[in-house]
Curated annotation (Swiss-Prot):
Catalytic activity: Exonucleolytic cleavage in either 5'- to 3'- or 3'- to 5'-direction to yield nucleoside 5'-phosphates
Record note on quaternary structure: Heterooligomer composed of large and small subunits.
SUPFAM superfamilies listed in its UniProt record: XseB-like
Name of this protein: Exodeoxyribonuclease 7 small subunit
Upper taxonomic lineage: Bacteria, Bacillati, Bacillota, Clostridia, Eubacteriales
GO CC field: cytosol; exodeoxyribonuclease VII complex
The keyword Nuclease is annotated on this UniProt entry: yes
Keywords: Cytoplasm, Exonuclease, Hydrolase, Nuclease
Primary location: cytoplasm
NCBIfam families attached to this UniProt entry: PRK00977.1-4, xseB
Biological processes, Gene Ontology terms: DNA catabolic process
C-alpha cells in the first residue's frame, strides 16, 4: 500500500493541534508522551521537507544566475 504524502500546511496544522492538546493539560501522562512523540516525528518531517524545498530553490536560483550570465539583480 502506498504511503500518502502529507503537505506542509496539514503537518503544521496537526502539530498545532498537538501543542494545543498538550497545553490544555487534559491528557493523561501516557497520552501526553504519545502526543509529544508524534509531534517530534512531525517536526522532523517538516524539517526534512523544508530542507528539500530549500535545495530546490537553490537549484532554481543557480539556474537563474546562469541564464542571466551571472549578473545580480541588485542595482
Amino acid at each position: 500500500m502506498a504511503r500518502k504524502e502529507t503537505n506542509y500546511e496539514s503537518m503544521v496544522s496537526e502539530l498545532n493541534e498537538i501543542v494545543k492538546q498538550l497545553e490544555n493539560g487534559d491528557l493523561t501522562l501516557e497520552e501526553s508522551i504519545k502526543s509529544y512523540e508524534n509531534g517530534v516525528k512531525i517536526v522532523n518531517k517538516l524539517y526534512k521537507k523544508l530542507s528539500t524545498l530549500e535545495g530546490k530553490i537553490k537549484v532554481v536560483e543557480d539556474e537563474k544566475e546562469e541564464d542571466f550570465g551571472g549578473y545580480s539583480n541588485e542595482y
